[in-house]
Amino acid sequence: MLARSLGYRLISTSRILYNKPTVKSVVSSCPAGTSLNLNIWKSGKDAVALEDKEYPNWLWSVLDSDHVVEHAAEDPEGQALLKRRKNIRKANRQRIKQNNFLSQL
């Protein structure tokens, strides 16, 4: 029995595994006060970058795919929404391919 138990690999249960990683402070790509040249109106003003702390916290995690999947797993409606979006994208691609094929005839 002792020989049998030595063949198994022990699983580490250290506290490091249970601790969630701390949120890293994200630094924006441009300093505060920089003109972003996003104006689309003739008489409008250019948008100006703000301090990083003035933006909402969720903004820094929008592009993280892990973050989207994590929240979708928590929310069953969100998971259904992701599945619906995927199906809509697939249908749109198919429609575009069909239209391109028909335009070549």
Curated annotation (Swiss-Prot):
Residue stretch of the organelle transit peptide: 1-24
Cellular component annotations (GO), alphabetically ordered: mitochondrial inner membrane; mitochondrial large ribosomal subunit; mitochondrion
GO molecular function, one term: structural constituent of ribosome
Stretches assigned to coiled coil: none
Compartment(s) where it occurs, according to its Swiss-Prot or TrEMBL record: Mitochondrion
GO terms classed as biological process: mitochondrial translation; sporulation resulting in formation of a cellular spore
Note: Present with 1100 molecules/cell in log phase SD medium.
UniProt record similarity statement: Belongs to the mitochondrion-specific ribosomal protein mL54 family.
The protein's assembly and partners: Component of the mitochondrial large ribosomal subunit (mt-LSU). Mature yeast 74S mitochondrial ribosomes consist of a small (37S) and a large (54S) subunit. The 37S small subunit contains a 15S ribosomal RNA (15S mt-rRNA) and 34 different proteins. The 54S large subunit contains a 21S rRNA (21S mt-rRNA) and 46 different proteins.
Role of this protein: Component of the mitochondrial ribosome (mitoribosome), a dedicated translation machinery responsible for the synthesis of mitochondrial genome-encoded proteins, including at least some of the essential transmembrane subunits of the mitochondrial respiratory chain. The mitoribosomes are attached to the mitochondrial inner membrane and translation products are cotranslationally integrated into the membrane. mL54 may have a meiosis-specific role as it accumulates during the middle stage of sporulation.
Name by which UniProt lists this protein: Large ribosomal subunit protein mL54
Species of origin: Saccharomyces cerevisiae (strain ATCC 204508 / S288c) (Baker's yeast)
Lineage, opening ranks: Eukaryota, Fungi, Dikarya, Ascomycota, Saccharomycotina
